[in-house]
Structure formats: structure tokens, C-alpha cells
Swiss-Prot record:
Top-level taxon of the source organism: Archaea
Gene Ontology terms: biological process: regulation of DNA-templated transcription; transcription initiation at RNA polymerase II promoter
Protein name per UniProt: Transcription factor E
Gene: tfe
Function as written in the Swiss-Prot or TrEMBL entry: Transcription factor that plays a role in the activation of archaeal genes transcribed by RNA polymerase. Facilitates transcription initiation by enhancing TATA-box recognition by TATA-box-binding protein (Tbp), and transcription factor B (Tfb) and RNA polymerase recruitment. Not absolutely required for transcription in vitro, but particularly important in cases where Tbp or Tfb function is not optimal. It dynamically alters the nucleic acid-binding properties of RNA polymerases by stabilizing the initiation complex and destabilizing elongation complexes.
The keyword Transmembrane helix is annotated on this UniProt entry: no
Family: Belongs to the TFE family.
Organism field: Saccharolobus islandicus (strain L.S.2.15 / Lassen #1)
Length: 178
């Protein structure tokens, strides 16, 4: 069975790539707040590289920080911690982003007419096809009308599915907080 930390790391890896995982692992293993300098020392990498990774992780909600001012130098010190308890919210936000992209794509499919090359399946909008005299740019074949009903139907089904998931997960989250 996959534990929460593995799931958290795999999610970060799928959204941000392998580069940030070393920093996330150190924070998870430590279990308490760490400064960027402590992380850099433990990983033996530059503090600036750690900061870049922390900022990427923070943008997606994987880590958060609190800052204090050093009394001697006047510089800010950032204390970072993993937000493993926010994994459901991170997933929910990702689904919302995907939903927005699917809705945009559906609008694009609904608002445009398409043509396709029967030889290589290159797809062209009406404007592109018109500019090229309804000939394929790659092979010169005559383009044919492309019916997007299957694509629109698929997109609509995926949109409904994700909306239902978001709705269900939002209700579950609201019930947990009571």
C-alpha cells in the first residue's frame, strides 16, 4: 500500500518533475521546519538552487513558509515545511485547472470548423484550410470536412466527470471540517 508521503512525492514529481523531489524529501524526512540554508547544506547544493525549488513547490501548494527577521543582520529568514495535509486541496486545484482547459478546448471545438487531410490526418481550422486552398500543407492532398461531434461528446463527458469529482470532493472536504 502506498503511504501518504509517497503519494505526495509522486504528485509533486508528476506536476513539477524530478528536480524538486530532493528538497521535498529532506523536508518530509526532517518533519519540522527548515531554512533554505539548512536544506542546501544537507543536500550539498547552492542555496539559490534550493530557493528556486522551494518557490516552485510553494506555487503548487506543496510547501509553505513563515518568515522572521534576523535581529543581527536585519535579513529575513524563511522557515519551510511540507504541506502534506494539503494533498487533497492540491489535487482538487489540479482538477480545476484541467477542467478549465477542457472547457476552453470544448469552446474552441464548438466555435470552429475543421478540415482534415485523408493521407496524414493533419487537422486544419477553416481559416487555415481556406488560406491553403483546402490542400494539405505537408502532402498537397485535398482536405475533407472533419466532424468534431465525437471530440465534443468526449470533452463534454470528461467535463461532467471532473465536475462531479470536484463537487463530490468539495462536499467531502466541507463535511470533514464540521
Amino acid at each position: 500500500m502506498v503511504n501518504a508521503e509517497d503519494l505526495f512525492i509522486n504528485l509533486a514529481k508528476s506536476l513539477l518533475g524530478d528536480d524538486v523531489i530532493d528538497v521535498l524529501r529532506v523536508l518530509l524526512e526532517k518533519g519540522t521546519e527548515m531554512t533554505d540554508e539548512e536544506i542546501a547544506n544537507q543536500l550539498n547544493i547552492k542555496v539559490n538552487d534550493v530557493r528556486k525549488k522551494l518557490n516552485l513547490l510553494e506555487e503548487q501548494g506543496f510547501v509553505s513558509y513563515r518568515k522572521t527577521r534576523d535581529k543581527d543582520s536585519g535579513w529575513f529568514i524563511y522557515y519551510w515545511k511540507p504541506n502534506i495535509d494539503q494533498i487533497n486541496e492540491i489535487l482538487l486545484n489540479r482538477k480545476r485547472l484541467i477542467l478549465d482547459k477542457l472547457k476552453s478546448r470544448l469552446e474552441y471545438e464548438k466555435n470552429n470548423t475543421f478540415f482534415i487531410c485523408p493521407q496524414d490526418n493533419s487537422r486544419y481550422s477553416f481559416e487555415e484550410a481556406f488560406e491553403n486552398e483546402f490542400k494539405c500543407l505537408k502532402c498537397g492532398s485535398q482536405l475533407t470536412y472533419y466532424d468534431t461531434e465525437k471530440i465534443k461528446s468526449f470533452l463534454e463527458q470528461k467535463i461532467r466527470q471532473i465536475e462531479e469529482e470536484i463537487d463530490k470532493e468539495t462536499k467531502l472536504g466541507a463535511n470533514k471540517s464540521h
